[in-house]
Regions:
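Active-site-adjacent "lid/gating" segments in soluble enzymes
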Residues: 1-138, 142
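Flexible, small-/acidic-enriched active-site or ligand-binding loops
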Residues: 52, 161, 231-280
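A structural signal for well-ordered alpha-helical segments within the folded catalytic domains
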Residues: 63-70, 146-149, 188, 260-263
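Beta-rich nucleic-acid/ligand-interaction surfaces
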Residues: 96, 170, 209-216, 287
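Aromatic-enriched alpha-helical interface/lid elements that frame and gate functional surfaces
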Residues: 126-201
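A glycine-rich dinucleotide-binding beta-alpha-beta segment and adjacent secondary-structure elements
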Residues: 196-252
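Non-catalytic accessory regions
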Residues: 277-290
Length: 290
């Protein structure tokens, strides 16, 4: 896996996280493909900087990791089926093209890509953030027709009439109508009334990221974090396994320290103990002391 593919003048060039994000458009898409055209004051610059950093952080490398994992699994599957291994070539540009597949190709009659609104609240009136009473927020996610119907039925049961037809529209009138409904109660009320009934609506501002990973009941029930011991830092919580094949989480270790496995790797490729010790003494290889 590299940045620019196996051939051509860029094959040996390094590539870092922001490059494919910028070239493939994923970062700008997260911002609604909007950038200010006028000179900004300091508060506005801070807002746009925050948006840019958040849009970039979750894009190019995670997209590439998804494609690397999928490609490795496909290769292993092919090996298992055919008995033959094969070389798999992946690059960051291609990986991010896959992640932006809904807008990477252009053809006559192609439907436009769903775009975030100017305030970056969401993609559609039925898939966005809404402010509620007590300065709280919910995220509503009812993209399918059956989900819209369930949402409308639940509102009716709460004494709030809503025409299901408007939920299919993508306009400010629908946003305004739903905004007025959600402002009537706080986020805790809406989550309690809608989520247990199968309506995708949850409070969106309950925790900061750190508090979420440490204290959210859903995180704990899914074992999304796991305690471990780092040789330098001591006991800490790390993320749990992203994929499990059973009822329990595997035991996960901390990340390796710098050079931790250098001696093992050199031994695997034929270096004897004396040669490895000499490389360490010369400073050719180095390992971090715990």
């Amino acid at each position: 896996m590299n940045g620019y593919g196996p051939d051509g003048p860029g094959a040996q060039r390094p590539s870092t996280h922001p490059i494919p994000g910028a070239a493939m458009g994923g970062v700008l898409y997260q911002m609604g493909e909007r950038m200010p055209e006028q000179q900004q004051d300091i508060p506005a610059l801070r807002t746009w900087t925050r948006r840019l950093m958040r849009a970039n952080e979750l894009n190019p490398d995670p997209n590439t990791a998804m494609v690397v994992c999928s490609s490795a699994l496909l290769g292993l599957n092919a090996l298992q089926r055919t008995g033959k291994g094969q070389r798999i070539l992946i690059d960051m540009f291609g990986a991010n093209a896959y992640a932006n597949h809904d807008d990477f190709l252009s053809y006559p009659g192609k439907a436009p890509r769903a775009m975030p609104d100017e305030g970056l609240h969401g993609l559609h009136p039925s898939y966005r953030l809404y402010a509620t009473a007590e300065d709280q927020w919910v995220f509503l996610a009812v993209p399918e027709e059956k989900e819209k119907k369930r949402f409308a039925e639940r509102l009716t049961a709460l004494g709030i009439e809503v025409d299901i037809a408007i939920l299919t529209r993508n306009d400010e009138t629908t946003v305004g109508h739903l905004s007025e409904i959600f402002k009537g109660k706080n986020a805790e009320f809406w989550e309690a009334q809608l989520a247990p009934q199968g309506v995708g609506c949850v409070r969106a501002d309950r925790y900061s990221p750190v508090e979420f990973w440490w204290h959210d009941p859903q995180v704990q029930s899914l074992n999304l974090t796991q305690p471990t011991e780092h040789p330098a830092w001591g006991a800490y919580d790390r993320h749990g396994a992203n994929v499990t094949f059973g009822r329990s989480q595997p035991t996960l270790k901390p990340p390796p320290t710098a050079g931790q496995h250098a001696e093992e790797l050199l031994a695997e490729i034929g270096y004897d103990s004396a040669s490895i010790a000499k490389l360490l003494a010369q400073g050719t290889i180095w390992k971090e002391q715990a």
